Amino acid sequence: MTEAPVHRGTRLSRGARRTQLLAAAREVFAAHGYHAAGMDGIAERAGVSKPVLYQHFPGKLELYRALLTASADELVDRVRSAIDSSTDNRERSRAAVAAYFDFVAGEGQAYRLVFESDLRGEPEAAAVVQSALTRCLDAIAAAVTTDAGLDPPRARLLAVGLVGLSQLGAQYWLDADRMVPRDEAVDLMARLAWGGLAGFPRIHDADQ
């Protein structure tokens, strides 16, 4: 369910206006893609004039980059919070899977900008997406390294597997009209992930 556009003339602080413009842009970009979206449509969706939009963003590319960065940072924050949510590896692996499902199912379809961008060939946009992936892998690999005692290359490979499983599973679940309830879908994917991770005993347990 989308929010109704703010009527023209509504006075907002600069920060609130920027947030409003980004929300409107996310809806337009998610619905039409970068190339088909226009500043006219974004301004109309936000309920502002084009000059107001250009006061905050000099062009469509800059607006897209700002939105992509915010969406990518949201994903990274979700994954980091999941890893930090528990010291139990099984709970952490489920939380990491759930982080991707919640990001994909979130309002505004921000995930489409990160995972399905039609601007992947633009260097700065590609760098933002790669940075988000790297930071997610860093968080998961660090936990695997600490708990399983694996060296960084092997821990990172496991992290890539968990990220791929979570991301693709969540996207398929959404594209398939959520064929099973969200919690059940998360449990299924988490059980698959844990079936692999459980094969690596915690180094702290091995030392006892």
What label would you give each PLM region?
Residues A66, R80-Q109, L158-L162, V186:
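Hydrophobic alpha-helical connector segments
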Residues H35-A36, L150-P153:
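Short, charged helix-capping/linker segments at alpha-helix termini
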Residues M1-A16, P201-Q208:
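N-terminal intrinsically disordered/low-complexity leader segments
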Residues R112-F115, R182, D205-A206:
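Short, hydrophobic secondary-structure boundary micro-motifs
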Residues Q20, A24, V28-E62, A66:
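Helix-turn-helix
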Residues F103-A127, A141, L168-D175:
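Amphipathic alpha-helical segments used for helix-helix packing
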Residues A37, R65-S71, V129-A132:
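Alpha-helical DNA-contacting segments of helix-turn-helix folds
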Residues D73-V76, P123-A148, R156-G161, L168, ...:
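Amphipathic alpha-helical packing segments from all-alpha helical-bundle domains
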